[in-house]
Amino acid sequence: MPLEKEIIKRGWEIQWFADLEDGKKALKHKTNQLNTIEQVSIYRPHVILAVTNDIPDFINALKVQIFHGFLTHKRPEKNTESHFRIRGFFDLYCTQGPSTTSVFKTLSKKLKHFEVAETGWSKVDPLFPIEKRERHSSPTVMVASTFTKRLSLAYNDAVIKKIKDLSESGLFKFIVVLHPKIPKEIIKRWENIQNNNLKYENTTDLIPLFKKTDIMLADTTSAIQEYLLQKKPVVTFRHNVKRNYLVQIEDVEDIESALNKALEYPTYLLDNINKFTMELHPYQDGQSSARVMDACIDLLTKDTSYMRAKPWNLIRKYKIRKRLGIFTLKSYNRPFKPKM
């Protein structure tokens, strides 16, 4: 993981912690993890980097939000409201690019109890530098899907048949990746159509697959934004928001022509992709993890007396204690400062 590599490179120590089942499964291979909130308290970290919406306020550490993903547009109003909701737990928000930085900085000026640093998103560090891919007579298409049934192409029988037919024709090669929460019976249907030109990949490590493919076919999956950072076109099937940086279709019959259009890499489309990604995530140096850690050190070491105390948030704090099974009156509402 890019952030872990950066932390170790600096000679610092890192421990992982998750209290929810999905997080625990993701960390099951980790030897450097804390298994209980009591262990976290004893560990006494200087910095907590979180992708979750809340964080235990009773741990005295600098609390930093690094985000789980880009702002998506599956359900625009809901996503936007959730992405920019300030819950009063964090001292620092490490934003990904101008499109989110501007909003968080406006909120910071208004609320005055957190800082904002535009760092880029550490998860995509391995994507850079962008490697130029040689074009082949049989281009490779990455198929990616979200797990919400009404938004997902993975459940669509006609889409499955079309991809199967196109792969068997030899015109395209396909690499299929489905969201891990998609039911096993749906995944099995995709596994069953595998052939020399179509492979299903059971992985959540998408960046190597991004690099192996020429274009993407997707629905509303959040992988779209990450893929576009390569300046490679994306065809979307029944995406619910119109975007000029996507090739968007509604009908299965249009899949082949849309893929061919995307493979032309039309100038107007690449221009729109570039404009979008410069707002989303302009950093292409693979150094976002370093910027995150620099921002943490900066806030740890500078005078933060100008910052207000974080809000009481009594109901949210109670819910955290109930979830973790620990009840304490401790609550640290100002940025942590290590003893020098």
Question: What feature does the model see in each segment?
Answer:
Residues L27-E38, N60-G69, W190-E201, K232, ...:
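Active-site regions of enzymes building and remodeling cell-envelope glycoconjugates
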Residues N53-F67, T203-L246:
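A donor-sugar binding/catalytic signature common to diverse glycosyltransferases
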Residues S257, L263-M340:
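C-terminal amphipathic helix plus adjacent low-complexity
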Residues R87, H113, E191, S222-Q284:
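Catalytic binding pocket for nucleotide-activated donors in carbohydrate/polymer assembly enzymes
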Residues E13-D19, P45-V51, Y93, F174-I182, ...:
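Short, hydrophobic beta-strand segments that form beta-sheet elements in well-ordered domains
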Residues L34-S41, I182-L229:
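Donor nucleotide-activated moiety binding/catalytic core segment of transferases
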Residues M1-F128:
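Active-site and donor-binding regions of nucleotide-sugar-utilizing enzymes
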Residues L3-I8, V116-W190, Q284, A290:
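Conserved catalytic-core segment of nucleotide-activated headgroup transferases in glycan assembly
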